[in-house]
Amino acid sequence: MSRCSNAALMTVVEDAVGARVAARTRNMSNGVNYREKEVNDLTADISDSDSDLDSEDNKHGKGDNDTAPIWLQDDVHSDEDIQLDSEDDSDTEAVQAQVVDKLAKDTKSEQKSLDDELSEMDTKTVSLKLKKLNEFVRQSQVYSSIIADTLLHRSNEVANANTKDNSNSDDEEHSSKKRKTKKKSITDFFKKQKKNEDTTTQNGAPDDAAIKQPRLLKNCILKPYQLEGLNWLITLYENGLNGILADEMGLGKTVQSIALLAFIYEMDTKGPFLVTAPLSTLDNWMNEFAKFAPDLPVLKYYGTNGYKERSAKLKNFFKQHGGTGIVITSYEIILRDTDLIMSQNWKFLIVDEGHRLKNINCRLIKELKKINTSNRLLLTGTPLQNNLAELWSLLNFIMPDIFADFEIFNKWFDFDSLNLGSGSNSEALNKLINDELQKNLISNLHTILKPFLLRRLKKVVLANILPPKREYIINCPMTSAQEKFYKAGLNGKLKKTMFKELIKDFFTLNDEYIGHVSNRSIRDFINYKLSGNETSNTDNKINPTLLQMDKLYKKNLQMEISNKKLQNMMMQLRQIIDSTFLFYFPYLHPEDLTLETLLKTSGKLQILQKLIPPLISEGHKVLIYSQFVNMLDLIEDWCDLNSFATFRIDGSVNNETRKDQLEKFNSSKDKHNIFLLSTRAAGLGINLVGADTVVLFDSDWNPQVDLQAMDRCHRIGQESPVIVYRLCCDNTIEHVILTRAANKRNLERMVIQMGKFNNLKKLALNEGSFLKANKAGVNVTNKDLVQELSMLLMSDESNIGFENGGQKENKATEGQLTDKEVEELTNRSLEAYKANRVVDLPHVKLFETTSGL
């Protein structure tokens, strides 16, 4: 790299550091109550009472801002000092010992397997329940057949009407020449398919009757599966049916939709057409129309200057194009400009990210249903979830005359009336019943959905087109600091531990600005603040050093602690596994943060330190996703300390900035090699094929969110093999999240055991299924979960299969990937993407390979 390039890069990094330094400030606040709450006590942490030391300042008539700068210097010599981490943790060890004892007792008492349980059950009871089950399945089959017959009848009426219109038309010959294809009947979609329902079509060429690519679609050649998707969309349109195009992310739902509108436009129905989408995707829609259908008139109906400006823009557009064309707008504008939108007669309505309409009672779906339109199309890359109410909401939107009553729909599929008595059954019998219900209900619901839902998977239709992708799980054992926080969280002592560590770090890391104070004084100050006896102290009893320390504490730290809400145990544990600095930041001046200190707070950052620099040096571009915006701050600090130039998108980044960053990052000439993204805010409507590496710093409870994040770079347009690194801390709450992902994705090769952790198993696998659409999910207390999480943490073996047994790492080598592991993780050869490879390394497991060779 040239000297000029280096200088430019450093300028970028320094600007980023300066912006973040300005953002980190502290102020004074209310006092804090350090007494620990019960595990399930989720009340606020801030106390309204002030300590006696607070009144000390008032006594002298001066506040923090009026005092001279404080400089600490006590008289404890270094050879007389103590170790800060030498405090007695016997209470924590006692709790852990109780957990181990309970684990041993539970192991000894559980003797029978699920198979034995089932074999000893009363045979007549099992037979009776299975008979009821079969009757229920047949009942739902009847309903599916009724719906199919209704759709057939309706489509035949539309077909007959079209035939009659064509016979009376003077342009019949012209129309037949224009189409040059045989119109396909919707009955074709009711024929039995031998292929898997999810894949529907093969990657072959369409048949002779398929619609050809519209002439107005330019600068691209539709792939065979996209032509087949277009054919399906046109068939629905010609049969008077609405539909859901649910192709997996990255298969080109946008270009297929544009092709459909181009076809309709060529058939002399020139609109107006309305496309509504999330704000973040509007520019992408505009770019796609400009690229693939430049001759179609398109308006981006959006603006922040008020209704008058927007309405004038729309009226001018319609005046210019004779009331035709395509209007693209956001959900927010639909809700704001309802009257203007409703006043138009739209020929076609396309709703992008249609899965957002799953709540029938939300205002958006109510307003969209009021829009005057002849046809509706929903686009979604998220598969339909196993929830009757959500499924019916989508069906009601696209076919309101057929799916008009949820109660009737629910009656045919609600199994509660069967009285199968799941509470009194064995786990084995419940599993048998649930599996049978799921299998048959899904089959029957697919019978209903088959005519107007199309979903193709990348691994099927792009098997020979898209570059391969492989996904690893990397075990990132907690550092000593993280393990201390995690155990404290489980034992109900997180607030106290956070306070102690903040005090220690603040007074040891900022001595350049506040002077030196001994470890003994720090310990005394901690004990003083935690004693609860501050109100009994008088002036002559207070050590002058402690008084000075307390002034610094109130000025710089009190706000930090007061504002930290410790109310959600699961969230606390997940954040601890990312970094302890998510709970406090001890530096007076953020620019003083060192790489060494930052790495001590996070085993995951230690893995990045070993893994990412070699990738950057080889020219790879990396996407790093996190669930937590404040974790993105720390990762950005880590990038700055390594002189990596970064872009960033989270919920606070405006649309124009997003667009500019995406364009630059996807350019091969741009020097930014890492893109930091908030998983939820940046998981949709973003194309980042400039990257070939994805890091999931933490996983989402919904595995589809993580898959969408990967699809930002593993999509059409990607030319390089892709590698995904999923960072995970074994035998912690992340183990539960990973179990959920593996289960939902049906990854049989990745066997993840939950053993005796029944409540954690329920938490991992519960998803509000078809079977209990409106029932509460897992009903266990925090105490039950804490107990099992403690047992999981103390397990001697890894439940995922890592060699080193979860957290039982040697802390001297914690987070250290071996050279062999780094070689495996960075291997881009085609050999590394072969299917069914076995990767057996201490910290690394191969989770999944797609489009494998």
UniProtKB/Swiss-Prot annotation:
Give the primary localization class: nucleus
Q: Give the EC number(s) under which this enzyme is classified.
A: 3.6.4.-
Q: Which SUPFAM superfamilies would you find in this protein's record?
A: P-loop containing nucleoside triphosphate hydrolases
Compartments in which it is found: Nucleus
Q: What class of enzyme is it?
A: hydrolase
Q: Report residues binding ATP.
A: 247-254
Compositionally biased region (Basic and acidic residues): 56-65, 185-198
Pfam name, any one: SNF2-rel_dom
Q: Which CDD domains match?
A: DEXHc_HELLS_SMARCA6, SF2_C_SNF
Which GO BP terms, alphabetically?
error-free translesion synthesis; mitotic recombination; positive regulation of transcription by RNA polymerase II
Which parts of the sequence form the motif DEGH box? 352-355
Q: Where is this region: Disordered?
A: 43-71, 158-207
The UniProt entry, under InterPro entries, shows: Helicase_ATP-bd, Helicase_C-like, HELLS_N, P-loop_NTPase, SNF2-like_sf, SNF2/RAD54-like_C, SNF2_N
Name the keywords, alphabetized.
Answer: ATP-binding, Coiled coil, DNA-binding, Helicase, Hydrolase, Nucleotide-binding, Nucleus
Q: Which residues form the Helicase ATP-binding domain?
A: 234-401
The transmembrane residues are none
One Gene Ontology cellular component annotation? nucleus
Helicase C-terminal domain boundaries: 607-758
Top-level taxon of the source organism: Eukaryota
Coiled-coil spans are 548-580
What family does this chain come from, according to its entry?
Belongs to the SNF2/RAD54 helicase family.
Q: What PANTHER family does the record point to?
A: SNF2/RAD54 HELICASE FAMILY (PTHR10799)
Q: What does this protein do?
A: Is probably involved in a pathway contributing to genomic integrity.
What name is this protein filed under?
Uncharacterized ATP-dependent helicase IRC5
Record the organism. Answer: Saccharomyces cerevisiae (strain ATCC 204508 / S288c) (Baker's yeast)
UniProt lineage: Eukaryota, Fungi, Dikarya, Ascomycota, Saccharomycotina
By which gene is this protein encoded?
A: IRC5
